[in-house]
């Protein structure tokens, strides 16, 4: 087993509650967008992703010839509320939450409808071959990505120890209610790329990153009535009002 015989610096970031996406760029041009899917194969959603205004179709500055940018497609609260109000007016079932709405939207056949729903996207990880990586740290790579035109969250911090990490988590556990989009936790990553190489991966995930999930928000509600709907095959489903 390998160990890191030096101090470790971490980057703490918001864990966006949306749809994971991989963006491929060649010679500064956006060429493909694929959902995460089962981890090895996802859906090609390039045409729909092109409608998201904060995803650059052409990069600026000094960028690598070929790389992938991982990110999250989200639906802001303002868009979510507007879409659900419109669906209710049309007698359609409203979306349960912004994540489901974003997931359904990027798979629509009509790109014009996707554009009208005003999705956002945040980038959080740059992927390229190790021998072509031009940065020493994760934080440096995201700072460069922002210069090239990517939308990178400003809500991240370099943490030197456990106390710094706990402070970041506690702060955003309180402040998340004020954000214009949903988050469901904090992602903690080792900042230095060489240290990441030493730590490596398990069969399912990197050893240099971990997600802290917030507790689900709780609220009181009142049950007014229960309707019973009968399906085509005679299945009876209770529906609470």
Predicted features and spans:
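RNA/tRNA-interacting regions in translation and RNA-turnover enzymes
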Residues: 1-241
């Amino acid at each position: 087993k390998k160990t890191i015989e030096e101090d470790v610096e971490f980057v703490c970031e918001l864990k966006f509650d949306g749809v994971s996406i991989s963006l491929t760029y060649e010679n500064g041009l956006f060429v493909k967008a694929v959902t995460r899917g089962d981890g090895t194969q996802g859906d090609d959603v390039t045409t729909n992703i092109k409608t998201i205004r904060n995803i650059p179709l052409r990069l600026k500055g000094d960028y690598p010839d070929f790389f992938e940018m991982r990110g999250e497609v989200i639906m802001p609260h303002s868009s979510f509320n507007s879409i659900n109000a419109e669906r209710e007016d049309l007698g359609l079932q409203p979306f349960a939450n912004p994540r489901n709405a974003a997931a359904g939207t990027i798979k629509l056949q009509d790109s014009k409808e996707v554009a009208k729903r005003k999705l956002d996207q945040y980038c959080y990880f740059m992927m390229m071959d190790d021998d072509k990586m031009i940065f020493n740290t994760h934080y440096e790579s995201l700072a460069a990505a922002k210069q090239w035109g990517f939308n990178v969250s400003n809500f991240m911090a370099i943490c030197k120890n456990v106390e710094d990490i706990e402070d970041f988590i506690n702060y955003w556990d309180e402040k998340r209610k004020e954000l214009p989009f949903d988050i469901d936790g904090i992602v903690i990553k080792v900042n230095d790329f060489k240290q990441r190489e030493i730590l490596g991966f398990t069969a399912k995930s990197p050893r240099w990153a971990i997600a802290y999930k917030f507790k689900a928000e709780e609220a009181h509600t009142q049950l007014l009535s229960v309707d019973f709907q009968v399906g085509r095959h005679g299945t009876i489903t209770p529906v609470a009002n």
